[in-house]
């Protein structure tokens, strides 16, 4: 379950930012996650709740912004929507796709006090 290490990394980032920007508590965290990031959102929520106990983010809301998956098709030279890696191009059926969006996992915004 790599979601646990992701949650731990988020808490570490929050602690670093708290020291740098001098805030004491995190009330909410917004994450952008693409469908190609290989993250199970419900597992991440569970892990986030577990690792934030006793930290400056204890009780913080975890808001997930799901990004669409997109790829450039080398077969028909078009930008196309994809739901998972190794999907065929919905326009021409080619499997020669380069992912351009959807593999992100990043902290987008924080609500702090």
Swiss-Prot record:
It comes from the Bacteria. Gene3D superfamilies: 3.30.2320.80. Involved in the maturation of [NiFe] hydrogenases. Required for nickel insertion into the metal center of the hydrogenase. Pfam families: HypA. Keywords: Metal-binding, Nickel, Zinc. PANTHER family: HYDROGENASE MATURATION FACTOR HYPA. InterPro entries: Hydgase_Ni_incorp_HypA/HybF_CS (IPR020538), HypA/HybF (IPR000688). This is Hydrogenase maturation factor HypA. Belongs to the HypA/HybF family. GO terms for molecular function: nickel cation binding; zinc ion binding. It comes from Azotobacter chroococcum mcd 1.
């Amino acid at each position: 379950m790599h979601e646990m290490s992701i949650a731990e990394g988020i808490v570490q980032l929050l602690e670093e930012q708290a020291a740098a920007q001098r805030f004491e508590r995190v009330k909410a965290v917004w994450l952008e996650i693409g469908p190609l990031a290989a993250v199970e959102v419900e597992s991440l929520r569970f892990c986030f709740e577990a690792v934030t106990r006793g930290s400056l983010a204890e009780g913080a809301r975890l808001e997930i912004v799901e990004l669409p998956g997109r790829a450039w098709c080398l077969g028909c030279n078009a930008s196309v929507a994809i739901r998972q890696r190794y999907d065929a191009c919905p326009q021409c059926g080619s499997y020669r796709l380069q992912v351009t969006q959807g593999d992100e996992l990043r902290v987008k915004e924080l609500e702090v006090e």
